[in-house]
Amino acid sequence: MLVAGISAPATAEWLLDADAGVLYDSNLNRAYESADIRADGAVTLGAAGGSYFALSGADGLTLTANARSEIYHRFHGLNLLGLGGTALYRHKFGLGYAAPWILLSASASHDNYRDDIRDSDRVELRAELGKRFTETFDAAFGGRFERRYAKNDAPAVPRISGKVFDLRGRSAYVRAGYAVSDQLLLGAELAVRRGDVVATTRRDFEIFVVSDAIAADPTFGSDFFAYRLRGTTDTAKLTASWALDDRSSLNFAYTDERTDAAGGIIYRSHSANLVYAWRY
């Protein structure tokens, strides 16, 4: 209905993307005791299709549907199939590469995991303001609101919720990109998020007393439990994209995260992923 309601002058361009890659995470379960930390790697697949509508010379709307999958080497309960969609609106305040822009987006998805404790629906809202300062350098800052609705409630403790993956959070970020050449683009992003986080560990009294949801998490072992608590996560991310041709690229990202949670609990994780992306 949204597409049909767009006025006649809008021109549409079909979009089709596909990607395949690998990822590694040093602390998948976000544990804070070294004996409980679990690392793993996965193969990732993704595809998206949709349309871009040029509403005017300064406004554009992109509507896409997407599917993604992650297949883990050791912890098969994390294997994922996700389906979703995104609406993204972008307005440019003027002509030329130096004119600033604003971006608004809304996305929703359903994530189905092999271990059904993680099955959930997600909603994300994002707003961004950015500017290209030179032909090779741009920067932006923005904010996100995330809501995840858990599909299953499996409490491990009486009178305490088992919907560990029923989460909400807000974040702010700043990012920048620099085109070293026609082929190589480098990027960096800093973000801070405040909201619900999940840590999976063996039974632990310190985390138990500050948690508001607890459930058994057999993905990581029969004696592991997932705990939901409040926390602040600081993230630093570095990216590099190498254009192979007009339609494909090889993309690398390294991410470092530190979370300070309730009760003085602190955990860190490092992740890296390499993705081949193709666009029609």
What kind of region is each of these model predictions?
Residues 44-48, 82-88, 124-126, 171-173, ...:
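Membrane-embedded beta-strand positions in outer-membrane beta-barrel channels/transporters
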Residues 20-28, 51-53, 67-73, 91, ...:
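Transmembrane beta-strands of outer-membrane beta-barrel pores
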Residues 24-46:
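Surface-exposed strand-loop-strand hairpins of Gram-negative outer-membrane beta-barrel proteins
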Residues 126-221:
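Detector for outer-membrane/organellar transmembrane beta-barrel domains
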Residues 56-61, 94-102, 133-141, 182-187, ...:
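Repeated loop/turn-to-beta-strand initiation elements of outer-membrane beta-barrel proteins
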Residues 49-54, 89-93, 129-131, 135-137, ...:
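Residue-level signature of outer-membrane beta-barrel architecture
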Residues 242-243, 267-280:
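Outer-membrane beta-barrel "beta-signal"
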